[in-house]
Amino acid sequence: MADKSHVNNVPMQGNGAYSSHAALQHEAMLKALPLFRAAAEAISKVDSTRVAIVEYGSAHGNNSLEPMEAILKSIHARSLELLFSDRPENDFCTLSKTVTEWADGLVENQLLHPLFISMIPRSFYQQVIPPKSAHLGFSLAALHHLDHVPQPTEDGQDESKLLQRQAHVDLATFLKLRSKEIVSGGSLILSFVGQASAGYENYGGPVDACRNAMIQMVQQDKIPVSVAQAFRVPTYNRTLSDVKKLMDEFTQIWKVHDLFEDDVMHPAFYELKIQSNPSQEASHKYAEIVIDWMMAVCSGYFTKALQVGSQGGYTKEEEESLLQDWVTRTKELFIRDHKDEEVICSFIYIRLERL
């Protein structure tokens, strides 16, 4: 069992903050909709009175609904079960509000299907639902998050190699678990952040600004070096080649219908570029948006680093103050060093059929 400080148990920023700052994830989801339509067409041919659709890693649910609607449009006169799952630490109150309001709207619009909704507080690196109980599963913008940070080995292996191996193990574990849960002929749709074949660094400007803001805080004795050393976001960006090699291990279980990568731009960049010469106000607004987007994912890991690196030496008020300091510095450094730069990310997309 991994040491608790290495376990990935940090949720996305709660109280609706993540859902309010997930525009890039929404853009990535839109590119996956054709895969959902293809999978829905296959489901429509299944001879079953009940169809179950499960999402692995729902967060607050704001990017779950359009894929669900794409599926529902192709399914007629059946009992539908929609299951939303995420780690126990997730903000299920926000998820419940998002999903309930959406479902109530469907019912008011005379949805033809009996609709049953469940939420499951369980990591997708564990079995989430009973065997052979789902017809379609999907996970969007989540699988680059690892189960835990691999600990250093005695022979001093390179950290990037350890992360690559952990990413391989985690994706293999995920596919094995889903193969138990999804019926033969069912579908699994995945999208996650990948390493761009074009060679660019994903959201390089915000990452650089975050890093330099933390260095600045250490240099000014705002935080000790131990906090900076404890800061880890347990992710790994797989290459398309990594994923293809892994899928070769599952040819008896999963059939690959689609496997490709695509670039996803933060939509705020398009809004900025509508202006031929963006004003200072527009540039500051852009910085606010893209850094708030990154912090919706990273802020919890900064707070965890404060707790681990100081061995619980900060009060909650001090943690909140230091977090706000880091966020403010990051925005200032983004404007100074990366003003108006595009924020782009490579995503890998997969559509699988359970054999």
From Swiss-Prot:
Its EC number is 2.1.1.-. InterPro entries: MeTrfase_7, MeTrfase_capping, SAM-dependent_MTases_sf. SUPFAM superfamilies: S-adenosyl-L-methionine-dependent methyltransferases. S-adenosyl-L-homocysteine binds at residues 18, 63, 86, 123-124. Its cofactor is Mg(2+). Binds 1 Mg(2+) ion per subunit. GO terms for biological process: methylation. Signal peptide: none annotated. Mg(2+) binds at residue 231. It holds the Pfam family Methyltransf_7. GO terms for molecular function: metal ion binding; methyltransferase activity. It is an enzyme of class 2 (transferase). Keywords: Magnesium, Metal-binding, Methyltransferase, S-adenosyl-L-methionine, Transferase. Methyltransferase; part of the gene cluster that mediates the biosynthesis of the mycotoxin fusarin C. Within the cluster, FUS1, FUS2, FUS8 and FUS9 are sufficient for fusarin production. The roles of the other FUS members are yet undetermined. The fusarin C synthetase FUS1 is responsible for the condensation of one acetyl-coenzyme A (CoA) unit with six malonyl-CoA units and the amide linkage of the arising heptaketide and homoserine, subsequently releasing the first intermediate, prefusarin, as an alcohol with an open ring structure. Belongs to the methyltransferase superfamily. Type-7 methyltransferase family. This is Methyltransferase FUS9. It comes from Gibberella moniliformis (strain M3125 / FGSC 7600) (Maize ear and stalk rot fungus).
